[in-house]
Amino acid sequence: AFDMLGCWYGHGETADITTIRTAVLKEFEGKADVDYVAGCPFEGTDESGFRAAIKAAKKADVIVACLGEKGKWSGENASRASIELPEVQQKFLEELKKTGKPVVLVLSNGRPLQLDRMEPLADAIIEMWQPGIVGGTPLAGILSGRVNPSGKLAMTFPVTGGQIPIYYNRRQSARHHQGFYHDMTSDPLYEFGHGLSYTSFEYGEPVLSAKKVGQKGRFSVDVTVKNTGAVDGKEAVLGFVSCPYAVLTRPVKELRFFTKKEIKAGETVTCHFDLNVQRDLGFVNDRGETVVEPGEYHIIIGGKTVTLEVTE
């Protein structure tokens, strides 16, 4: 239970933690039978718990595999040479997959992980991080379907550690259209802002109030978002800005504005953003001054791009 607190947990006490086991038993009480088996340790080579866990898993309709990092493995002055989970956890997940039952992988960790070996073994992944004393309760709600998840990743998950640094707002490279690696993709496993829901959303094309605007001007952008699924849900609408040409090399893209909307099944909403050129398109130059250079800027929402021209 202590490991759910993570680093810098302040006044959090182990005795106050609602564990995953406690929360799941309460959530499914009278609705489903829940068996709990401690299958493997965080690290080491002890596989003695595998047999009992596999036996229970074969009788289950769904397997929930809770894996991850110890609470002290991340935080201040706590680095790891490899961001894969230890081999004993990998082997345990492989054995669970062999049962043929659906596997929900629940991760509790304090950093992005390398999941290239684990992801193919999971039918679903819930990233709960190290959520503190009440973290078990919302997790149980997501597992039961009482809660429709709407979170988005605030960090990028690489395919392998060799891709690091791979943060979303990294600088443009000289040959960014050709990629970086000869032996693998340049794309991450899960990018910044990724996150699934029990419903689905469809974005319309962003619409600008003007195609051109002055360096000290204002403009707005509207985008429609439709809930195309069968259940109500919330969607975080993220607005990115990209400046392909500037005196200083600019990031590939930067998150500059966002909102979150609750959208009923079948409903379409319009998200409106009032933007300020200096505030939302500007950057700090090598003299510490906030500047906006004239030229082309891309506004990206829901993976769709519209181009704005900033004039002198």
Q: Predicted segment positions?
A:
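An anion/phosphate-binding loop that grips the pyrophosphate of nucleotide cofactors and donors
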Residues: A60
